[in-house]
Amino acid sequence: MRIVENNIIPFPDFGAINLFGEVFVREEWWDGLSPWSKKRTIIHESIHQAQMRELLYVGFYILYFFEWIYQIIVPPKGAYRWISFEREAFIHENDEEYLDNRKYFAQWREDR
């Protein structure tokens, strides 16, 4: 996974975004992170990359978008954190070995 530092992508309120396997980070945000926070971000985005591969990339973005819309409409408290893809990534972003043991479609499994 390649990390691209820049000042355009993602939008200013976000630090990192994974677009088709390339991770774009806001330069000033990335430079301010501790080494552990950088590692945690890489694990988080690597989990997203595994999710993308399972759903052939386009499927990931379609489902992510619709789940985000649903989470805004139904329980309007922090839709981003309630998206199944994000829940899995946040739960396991501190586990450096998670991807070695991750089950397919873990974002929808209770035992993730």
Regions found by a protein language model. Give the residues of each.
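Metalloprotease/metallohydrolase-associated module, dominated by Zn2+-dependent proteases
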Residues: 2-21, 27, 55-112
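Short, surface-exposed, low-complexity cationic segments
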Residues: 36-38
